[in-house]
Design a protein with these regions (language model features):
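RNase III-family endoribonuclease catalytic core
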Residues: 1-114
Length: 114
């Protein structure tokens, strides 16, 4: 397989390593508005986003659980919700430059959900 150098270099710069499966990273950056059809299935980032959200929730929950050892469940839940809310994640994505990786359709009126 011939590797296209540019995406690998960009991901290396952002992540600190070269991705093993570049197609998985490309799919993660494919907004629903730019879905492609493959074997009768619409391919985009939604399933990977679901998985990533679940993993992020678990990681943040673990960090908060260990950092705030005497805090009640309500505090931990509210704090986690504030950290992983869409607006916070969008702001982080822009600061990291992830918005430059997202492929979306120009027809979409709002594309700030990375």
């Amino acid at each position: 397989m011939l590797r296209h150098k540019e995406p690998y270099v960009l991901y290396r710069k952002l992540l600190g390593f070269y991705p093993t499966d570049i197609h998985l990273y490309e799919q993660a950056c494919l907004h629903r508005s730019s879905s492609i059809c493959e074997q009768g299935r619409r391919i985009n980032n939604e399933r990977l986003e679901f998985l990533g959200d679940a993993i992020l929730d678990a990681i943040v929950a673990d960090i908060l659980f260990h950092k705030f050892k005497t805090s009640k469940e309500g505090f931990l839940t509210n704090t986690r919700a504030k950290i992983v809310k869409r607006e916070s994640l969008n702001e982080i994505a822009v600061k990291l430059g992830l918005d430059n990786f997202i492929t979306y359709s120009m027809r979409t009126s709002s594309h700030n959900n990375y």
